Structures are given as structure tokens and as C-alpha cells.
Amino acid sequence: MNETPAVPPSPEVEGSLNEQISHRRRILAVLDAMKDGRALLSARIENQRGYFNTTLLKIDAEKGYVFLDELAPADGHEKIAVGQTLHLYGFYNNLPAHFAIEVIHVGEHEGIAFYAGPLPKLIHYQQKRAHFRAYVGLGKELKVRLRKGDGAQISGRLQDISLGGFGALMPADSVFEDLEIVEVEALELPDHHAIACSAEIRHSHPTQGRVHIGARFTQLAPQAERQLLQAIVELEREQLRKQSRD
């Protein structure tokens, strides 16, 4: 199974999935893309708490069935039964999507459980690219190092991040101009990797002995965008785990 973590959207994100795919051919195209891309889905059993990981194993377009891999962790499989509805969350073209499947069969193949259900009648998704913001927890120190146009280097702490940009806390004596272009020499991600790119300062203001900046990415390579997406998912997953403990 793909190791990239799946995560359900926050209520704000889920509420913004106001576009619908209802045409059968388009639904099949989306599901096939998720299956071929080995997209990891986050699954929630209706009327139950908790989220589990699964993937699409097979799409039977002729008979109109969808087959899902065994839920992980294992306690998810123990909770599922025929007649229940699985709500599934994932990404299609890097945009969040949601659909539901009624489980009509629970089977096993080579020691691994699977679930079958009819094709969903609707897929909800965000049609336009949305920059969902993930926040960096206080216990996690992710650094960002910027180089200004005059060559000065300034390092600070990453506070939030999205596919569109980031927020950071910089030293109190930092000076930034709105619309100033800076080089992001290193922006640390939760997986200990760092990306480099260019960014435009959108705003800056003093706060609690620091300077908070908001920046928009201006040049972001496809590989860096994929790394960012994975980082955002991981940060949201950590926040969900924290909320469940609280």
C-alpha cells in the first residue's frame, strides 16, 4: 500500500467541496485515475468515529462495482460490515475529493480483506485549485531561510504552509516590503526534506517580539509542489491525531 498518508479534509475544506460529478463516465474517469495513481484514501465509516486508510483495488465499469483494499489500521476492518456506508476522501489532480460507497460484500483474497460496493452516484470535489493552509504545531520546529535582493540572509520559523505560500515568524529586526521578491533558500518540511523556490512578500507586521510575514510562491517546481502537498497532508494528519487525543 502507498505510504503517503491520507487525511480527511477539515470541516472548512469539506464544506467547500461544492462541485459535483454525476455523469457516470466522468465518475469512472476520476476513480480510474485514483486507482492508477495508487491514491491513498482516508475512509470513515458512517456514524462512527475515526479514519482509516485504504486504496482502490479495481473498478468494474461493466458491472458497476468498486473494490477497496482492507482498512488500516486493522481495527477499521473489525468495525466494517455489509450494509454500512464508507465515506472516502482523497485527491484528484491534487484537489480534494469525497465520495461514498455502500458496502455490499466483504471478502478475502490471499489473506487480505477487500470490500465491494456499487459505483458512487456523486463525487464532490473542489473544482478550482484551492490553497488549503496547514499549521505547524508549537512542538515542531521547521525553519525557513530567505535571501533578500541585497544578499542578506534571514532565518525564521515556519508557521503555516499551503500550495500557494507560507507564513513565518522572523527576527524582530527583519524588514520586508510588500510585494518584495525573495529567494527561499530552504523551507523545511516535516519529512526532513527542504525545498527552494522564489516567493513574494504579501504582508509583514510585528507580533510578540517577532515579525510575521505572509508570502506567496512565485516559482514552484512540480517536484516541490508534490513535496508540499505531502507535507500539508502530514501536518493536517498530525492535527487530527492531536484533536482526537484532546
From Swiss-Prot:
<dbReference type="InterPro" id="IPR023787">
    <property type="entry name" value="T3SS_YcgR"/>
</dbReference>
<dbReference type="GO" id="GO:0071945">
    <property type="term" value="P:regulation of bacterial-type flagellum-dependent cell motility by regulation of motor speed"/>
</dbReference>
<protein>
    <recommendedName>
        <fullName>Flagellar brake protein YcgR</fullName>
    </recommendedName>
</protein>
<keyword id="KW-0547">Nucleotide-binding</keyword>
<dbReference type="GO" id="GO:0009425">
    <property type="term" value="C:bacterial-type flagellum basal body"/>
</dbReference>
<feature type="domain" description="PilZ">
    <location>
        <begin position="128"/>
        <end position="232"/>
    </location>
</feature>
<keyword id="KW-0975">Bacterial flagellum</keyword>
<dbReference type="InterPro" id="IPR009926">
    <property type="entry name" value="T3SS_YcgR_PilZN"/>
</dbReference>
<dbReference type="Pfam" id="PF07317">
    <property type="entry name" value="PilZN"/>
</dbReference>
<dbReference type="Pfam" id="PF07238">
    <property type="entry name" value="PilZ"/>
</dbReference>
<dbReference type="GO" id="GO:0035438">
    <property type="term" value="F:cyclic-di-GMP binding"/>
</dbReference>
<dbReference type="InterPro" id="IPR012349">
    <property type="entry name" value="Split_barrel_FMN-bd"/>
</dbReference>
<keyword id="KW-0973">c-di-GMP</keyword>
<dbReference type="GO" id="GO:0071973">
    <property type="term" value="P:bacterial-type flagellum-dependent cell motility"/>
</dbReference>
<dbReference type="InterPro" id="IPR009875">
    <property type="entry name" value="PilZ_domain"/>
</dbReference>
<comment type="function">
    <text>Acts as a flagellar brake, regulating swimming and swarming in a bis-(3'-5') cyclic diguanylic acid (c-di-GMP)-dependent manner. Binds 1 c-di-GMP dimer per subunit. Increasing levels of c-di-GMP lead to decreased motility.</text>
</comment>
<comment type="similarity">
    <text>Belongs to the YcgR family.</text>
</comment>
<comment type="subunit">
    <text>Monomer. Interacts with the flagellar basal bodies.</text>
</comment>
